[in-house]
UniProtKB/Swiss-Prot annotation:
UniProt-listed GO biological process terms: cobalamin biosynthetic process; thiamine biosynthetic process
GO CC, any one term: cytosol
Organism: Desulfuromonas acetoxidans (strain DSM 684 / 11070)
One GO MF term attached to the UniProt entry: 4 iron, 4 sulfur cluster binding
Top-level taxon: Bacteria
Cofactor note: Binds 1 [4Fe-4S] cluster per subunit. The cluster is coordinated with 3 cysteines and an exchangeable S-adenosyl-L-methionine.
Lineage: Bacteria, Pseudomonadati, Thermodesulfobacteriota, Desulfuromonadia, Desulfuromonadales
Cofactor(s) demanded: [4Fe-4S] cluster
Chain sites annotated for binding substrate: M95, Y124, H163, S186, K187, G188, N227, G228, L229, R230, E266, Y293
Protein known as: 5-hydroxybenzimidazole synthase
Family: Belongs to the ThiC family. 5-hydroxybenzimidazole synthase subfamily.
EC number: 4.1.99.23
Amino acid sequence: MKTQVEHAVDGIITEQMATVAHDEDLSPEYIRTMVAEGKIVIPNNSNSTPKPVGIGKGLRTKVNASIGTSSDIVNYQAEVRKARIAEQAGADTLMELSVGGNLDRVRREVLAAVNLPVGNVPLYQAFCDATRKYGSADKLDPEELFDLIEQQCEDGLAFMAIHCGINRYTIERLRKQHYRYGGLVSKGGTSMVSWMEHNNRENPLYEQFDRVVAILKKYDVCLSLGNGLRAGAIHDSHDRAQMQELIINCELAQLGREMGCQMLVEGPGHMPLDEVEANILIQKRMSNEAPYYMLGPISTDVVPGFDHISSAIGAAQSARYGADLICYITPAEHLALPNEDDVRSGVEAARVATYIGDMNKYPDKGRQRDKAMSKARRDLQWDKQFELALMPEQARQVRDSRLPEEEHSCTMCGNFCAANGSKTLFDGDLQGDKC
């Protein structure tokens, strides 16, 4: 069976491409061309029917939500509820990142619960299984890792974050720079580095990259090149280890595309705002515009409990400069496993961020909704305001909880409503458009 990339190269517009074109108000031929060039991906699986979601050049910036058990908290029903909440709140994709309990069970229950494209990190289960079976993650048998990747593809996952870019050379760059304020912050990345050091061997996901691609290509699953050496502190942003891994991932993205597999490149998690534009420019240049999946980024390290806000600020910048998929951050980041309220808050914050970013990335079409909202506010058209709101239910709920005496106003200003005063003063003189 051919992949989306192979169909696109052959000039065929698939059902998935046509759906994305309709949803994005773009031509099917544009989507086909970008998929063929590796600049748009549509996470998919030949064993399942996830909702077609386009990620990449010229498209709305998408939001990913991550859920999953931990070794301390295992509640399968709660993770299914979180997955459904993420979908209801407007997430475009979902990652199931469990490391506690029966990992096959939670993955399959989440896949059955939502219509979104679902991804994961195969290394999590591989190292968990090795620990249970052999007493140490460092005793992982690479053959069991490849078997697991295939099993998870068979279950219906649409994309996988796989840490192929960590190799002996990148680890040496980290060691020789003699600092890392935030240390290593990727669970999969840290475990793979430990395995490599303990066994004095190369990363099998890098060494046998063609084998990884062959498995995912068999199911038309999108390969997201994970960043196990990403910066976990803003003072580590763009250090040599992170950049070396990015270089390798961009090289692998090109190789994977040439083999007929859909490829994403993952970006960093902590980054000061003044470095965001440069980071995206570097990734786009080195990867020939492969879709970029940014993990936030968190733009300051000192607001635990409010990292969803810090991340939203960074995500707006990322979307504006060309990031294609943003992984949400919740208020629980750095503190605890997110609960259901945290998941909703994280999705909402990321949606606001990507909307703001897209307003500036696509100014011609991205600001028309805001113009319509401004007119509705000026004219005190409340139903129209709710219709245009990004999250209308929340807006309506707030207003209904504090209704004013006069229907046209709100309880913020009451009888001193500036919009109503403006309407009275100018009586239609402000109804025109800019020249």
